Amino acid sequence: MQKSKKIKIVKWIFMALLIVMFLAFVVPIPMNNVYDAIEIKLDDPNYLVKCQVKIYGKYHMNIFTDDMFDGKIVVSDYKLTNEKMSKMYFSDDGWPLEYIYVAEHDTEGRSNRDTYFLGRLYSKSWFRQMSIIVFSDNPVNKNEGGKAEGSWGDWNENDGYCIVPLANTREEALNILTKNELIRSNP
C-alpha cells in the first residue's frame, strides 16, 4: 500500500511539472527592464555616449523555434524607438529592430505609416549578452526625429556605431562585441 501511494505522489508531481512546463511555453512572460548602456563608434576612441535601453512587452518561449519578443525596445536619444515595434525573434544572425510610425495623413485623414530600422539586435535568449549595431544613417538623425530619406545605411566592423547594454567603458563594450563575434578583435 505504501508503494502505490508513493507512485501516485510521483505521478502527481510529474503531471504538475508537465503543466508548469506547458504553461511556460504557452503563456507569454511580461518584461519590464531598463539597462544602462553606452554607444560607441568603432573607429573613434573618443566617442562614448551613455544611454539607456528600455525593454517592455511580452517574452514568448518556444521549444522548436527561436524565442520571440512582442513589445518595445526604446533607446534613449533615438526618438523613433518610442514608436510601435515589430515582433523580434532571438536568432543567431540577429534581428532587425523595426519601428512603424505615422509618416503623414492622406487626403481622407487616414494614416500613412512608414518603417524605421534602428539596426540589428544580437542577443541570447532573455536579452542576455545584448548588443545593438546601429545602421550608419541613424546616429546623424538621433534627436531630429530620425526620419532619414531612403536607405537607413549599413554597418561594418571598422567604423560602425554600437549600443552595448551593461558596459561602462569602451573596453568593456569592445570585449562584449568580440565575445558576440560582431567584431574580430578590439580595434
Features from the language model and the residues they span:
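Charged, amphipathic alpha-helical segments
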Residues: 17-18, 48-57, 109-116
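Tryptophan-anchored aromatic micro-motifs
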Residues: 31-45
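Extracytoplasmic/periplasmic/luminal assembly and interaction segments
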Residues: 45, 50-101
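Non-cytosolic head/periplasmic domains of membrane-anchored proteins
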Residues: 87-187
